[in-house]
Amino acid sequence: KLANHLAGSLYDMLPADPKTVNPAGEWNTIVIRVKDGKVTHTQNGKKVVEYTLWSKEWDDMVANSKFKDFQGFQEGISHEGYIGLQDHGYPIWFRNIKIRELK
């Protein structure tokens, strides 16, 4: 398994560090905060990934990922829209999903 494909990571771009994922059978708590383009992933209370959307860093990560040819990534991530929840064919459960606007 690739490190940037595991829980808490920015999929195929940045691995979660430190690795704070709980073992199978235990719930993980993930918070993804986006404010003015700055994104932070927190997993089980620890910051594991940080990056800035709409930046050269972001464009470079996309160019070196599997998303380089995906519509919407090279043109730039939109400032509002949809979210996606992802799995890879294994059993998965979600609970207490909350989305709120930061003011």
Language model features: what each stretch is:
Residues 1-103:
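Carbohydrate-interacting regions of secretory-pathway proteins
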